[in-house]
Amino acid sequence: MAPWPELENAHPNPNKFIEGASGPQSSIPDKDKGTSKTNDSGTPVAKIELLPSYSALVLIEEPPEGNDPWDLPELQDNGIKWSERDSKGKILCIFQGIGKFILLLGFLYLFVCSLDVLSSAFQLVGGKMAGQFFSNNSIMSNPVAGLVIGVLVTVMVQSSSTSSSIIVSMVASSLLSVRAAIPIIMGANIGTSITNTIVALMQAGDRNEFRRAFAGATVHDFFNWLSVLVLLPLEAATHYLEKLTNLVLETFSFQNGEDAPDILKVITDPFTKLIIQLDKKVIQQIAMGDSEAQNKSLIKIWCKTISNVIEENVTVPSPDNCTSPSYCWTDGIQTWTIQNVTEKENIAKCQHIFVNFSLPDLAVGIILLTVSLLILCGCLIMIVKLLGSVLRGQVATVIKKTLNTDFPFPFAWLTGYLAILVGAGMTFIVQSSSVFTSAMTPLIGIGVISIERAYPLTLGSNIGTTTTAILAALASPGNTLRSSLQIALCHFFFNISGILLWYPIPFTRLPIRLAKGLGNISAKYRWFAVFYLIFFFLLTPLTVFGLSLAGWPVLVGVGVPIILLILLVLCLRMLQARCPRILPLKLRDWNFLPLWMHSLKPWDNIISLATSCFQRRCCCCCRVCCRVCCMVCGCKCCRCSKCCKNLEEEEKEQDVPVKASGGFDNTAMSKECQDEGKGQVEVLGMKALSNTTVF
């Protein structure tokens, strides 16, 4: 007999059998009785099933490696095949497909409209504050302050075109130089990427979908931040963007042209203008330093007005201020003259929901913000569900291959540049990089578009939004043509420079790796995604802006040590990953620091505890409301919420004693197995309780 009988005829499949063990034998068909094997004594030996826990393979077999979470999932079609349907089923399938397509277009339309209303809501909430940021000209000469002002203003108004138009107006009025406006343009480029990051939060229900969607959204953020980290110091030292755009304007003669074609606005404006209409000139007037604009409302009341010029008697300080000597007289106290005065006559009111409301801008903004976020979330959920039901089987295979497959060798390197052109063209059509990237985010989440393909599409959207700005600048009046065109060209060449830095060489595509790392963290700790948004788009810009108000010495004194600390951590992390041998033993990992300084687990425990306490309080409120409802209704149809039932069940389960599980002599058995059988069998000379389920 072998020294290790458990290993005889071993096979990874637990359904295989071994020989020489006694116990309850399964029935052997008559045709197999003649082929049963015998042992040395000549007695027949039956084959019995070996429980997995009795096999030494449980100890020596390595677990299979997990699948890569970044691999695109197989969207299998579990429905009835087309060939298996009858005529009625085929007709119903066609109508279902048409209905799903119509619903998809409808939800996509509501999705884009909700983004437009969301932008208006942000302008109502923070538009005047954004204008005040621009009106503080004392710190605009600081490039770092200009950068964070661009980020904050674009985040507040949720529109890079609005912030760019404010900058153009200030440059045309000589309130701001082109050199000081370039860092603000860079900040606006960063701030516009927050929209699709917010959209990615709506897919937090599924961890793998959220991992891909959040990484696909933040690849835009990392590209913009990395480009600014390199190009802002370069621009501050050499002013290459200013000189390059000056050279372009002097080389080519530009004339006033037509505005960029409104393709998407023509479809969405009839609906969004029924909800809210804003007077965006108020923000520009606040930025220009007009004190009277602070008391104006951003909500547009009168859409049709007429300006009339009339002659009116006005008082002047002295006769020298009169229009002419013939139109000047005094009454002994004041000097009067006749002047032309322009009066605006209101003709017709706007037709939107809030035109007759007397609510302040902040209240209307909060209402629209809440409603638009709810609609945005609902539309995104339905779009993902519809895409998940449509993109199955052969259709999904064709689309995934079309979007993610490279050109054949030796032209594979051209695929990414074609994707950049496609992204630029699509953004030019919809006239908004936020709309294009936000619509692409759910496709990344469900696995139709890979992160590697989404990256060049996102870079193309950055180019597309600048071409729209260039066409809009060409439609500007003559006094603002040069300034607006130069700023649009600065934005264009900034994005071109970023692409040259972070795309042509595969090794330099750091945004993809950083976005995947952040996606892994956010999938494990989903609260970290919200922290990322608040920290990088609100707290950090506000902190830098506050330090800029205190002056250069304070900004340098606080910022330089923080930057040096970040660089030290990055260098140490790189050495730990690449060359750990040159480091002391203590510095080869982060265990010398407290756990909360190098791990998110303690913070996750705190947040989980806080959310569970909030859930219990919420459930208590639900239980009270439920009981009041039952008392009022006088029936037993009302039921408490699901969370209340779960809490009550958990409390009951804690009071039920758990019976100790049966013990096993075999060391390969798990110590915590439940005894569900009553029969006893003898296997390999050892007695054990039979188990129908092993945990």
From Swiss-Prot:
Keywords recorded for this protein, A-Z: Cell membrane, Disulfide bond, Glycoprotein, Ion transport, Membrane, Sodium, Sodium transport, Symport, Transmembrane, Transmembrane helix, Transport
Ranges of the Cytoplasmic topological domain: 1-90, 158-213, 385-408, 508-526, 573-695
The organism's taxonomic lineage, starting at the top: Eukaryota, Metazoa, Chordata, Craniata, Vertebrata
Induction: Up-regulated by estrogen.
GO cellular component: apical plasma membrane; brush border; brush border membrane; membrane; microvillus membrane; vesicle
Domain of life: Eukaryota
UniProt tissue specificity: Highly expressed in the lung, in type II alveolar cells. Moderately expressed in kidney followed by small intestine.
Known function: Involved in actively transporting phosphate into cells via Na(+) cotransport.
InterPro entries attached to this UniProt entry: Na/Pi_transpt
Entry's transmembrane regions: 91-111, 137-157, 214-234, 364-384, 409-429, 487-507, 527-547, 552-572
Intrachain S-S bonds: 303-350
Region (Disordered): 1-44
Protein name: Sodium-dependent phosphate transport protein 2B
Glycosylation sites per record: 295, 313, 321, 340, 356
GO aspect biological process, one term: intracellular phosphate ion homeostasis
Pfam families: Na_Pi_cotrans
